[in-house]
A protein has these predicted regions:
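Helix-coil boundary and N-terminal low-complexity module in membrane systems
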Residues: 1-106, 110, 117-206
């Protein structure tokens, strides 16, 4: 009986954390003029999400600002190409959808490209903050994980789709919670996937 209040309290704490992380991500993205801010803000959010998932208690705003400054150049190098690729694919998808049935194969191709990009990105960002890797070194490793762990990849895409759908139904969530919730869930899941992968590659006693 006493477990339910504890679980409810923990769930509320996680929602509050996700909302605070979401707000910090928005504020620091805008502080960089959106284009220059989204890279370091995203890396900072994933860095703090990793530390939170590992049980650390930390001053969010001060630590966010510190990582944001430290990762300003590398964060942009990591994130901006992903944002640009997503923008091009989404724009082409909408364009081909507007052309009707004649462009259906091209529409499906761009949709497949968007799904593949989402899958790679879902591994790439948590990987960058978890391992000591250069931005360009993350892409091939994340791509291999997409193929090597199909069940994990499907789960990540399902969670992403659920967050996006919830934000679409309740637009307030998109502003107040969606990005922070996805970043925290994405990081939490990937830390477990990385641990499983390492255990498989380096079994104990071998």
């Amino acid at each position: 009986v006493t477990a339910w209040p504890i679980r409810l309290h923990a769930a509320c704490d996680e929602l509050v954390w996700a909302a605070r992380l979401n707000l910090a991500w928005i504020v620091f993205t805008l502080a960089g003029g959106a284009v220059l801010g989204i890279g370091p803000a995203t890396v900072a959010a994933y860095t703090l999400a990793r530390r939170h998932a590992r049980g650390e208690s930390l001053p969010l705003w001060r630590e966010f600002a510190a990582v944001y400054r430290r990762e300003f150049a590398r964060g942009s190098l990591l994130v901006l190409p992903l944002v640009a690729a997503a923008g091009v694919l989404y724009g082409n998808h909408r364009y081909f959808a507007a052309l009707g049935q004649g462009a259906e194969p091209l529409r499906l191709a761009t949709l497949a490209g968007l799904i593949a990009l989402a899958a790679v990105t879902a591994y790439l960002l948590p990987m960058y903050v978890h391992y000591d890797l250069k931005p360009l070194a993350c892409l091939p490793r994340a791509s291999r994980l997409v193929l090597a762990r199909p069940a994990s990849t499907v789960l990540l895409l399902f969670v992403l789709a659920a967050v996006v759908s919830a934000a679409g139904i309740l637009p307030f969530l998109a502003l107040a919670l969606a990005a922070g919730a996805w970043i925290q869930l994405n990081t939490w899941l990937c830390l477990r996937f990385f641990a499983e992968n390492e255990a498989h590659l380096h079994p104990k006693g071998v």
